[in-house]
Amino acid sequence: MTQATWYFDVISPFAYMQASRLAELPDTVELACRPLLFAGLLGHWGQLGPAEIAPKKTFTFQHSIWRARRMGLDFNLPPNHPFNPIRALRLCVALDDLAAIQSVFRAIWVDGHVPDNDAGWAGIQAAAGIDDGDARVADPAVKQALIANGEAATAAGVFGVPTFVIDGEIFWGDDAFDMVLDYLADPAMMATDAMKGAATLVPSSERKR
């Protein structure tokens, strides 16, 4: 079996889209779904999120609307974004079940339930088929697991969501899912001189910071 780790944050519309394709993974893959806080990745790498740059935020959501339509996915923007995803992420940790995680994604990106207000949180719990979400997300072990997921991700070089890590290789973004499938069919594709050269490309100029 090939071990694949999928890092995601429910705050990302593209993670929702990639979640819809996970059934396309071959049966030889053992998938570990790892929720993490995208904001933690941004802080670690010193980046701004796409929603923190006004014109980028607009295009990101226009692109997500277009992409979902192209994929034939139900998709609606939530009433607020960015929102605080912590409760939903901890719930995904606690549930530890792909179908339940997908129900959380749909609650946010189809039904418009955001986890940082009580009505939205109730809607997310209902979508997941539970009514004890507060107790589940308050579990110290769940809280620590979410933190550990973020630490493992940054240690692996993950810088965005959604991201697959397979055999130490990073595949970032919903639009890299076909690359994931190609790699699983032919792992040698990442061992070519061209692919290996991407890691050693030297800059001739750097911007001032």
Language model region names:
Residues 3, 11, 17-29, 103-209:
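C-terminal cap of thioredoxin/glutaredoxin-like
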Residues 10, 14-111, 194-209:
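Structural alpha/beta surface segment adjacent to cysteine/selenocysteine redox centers
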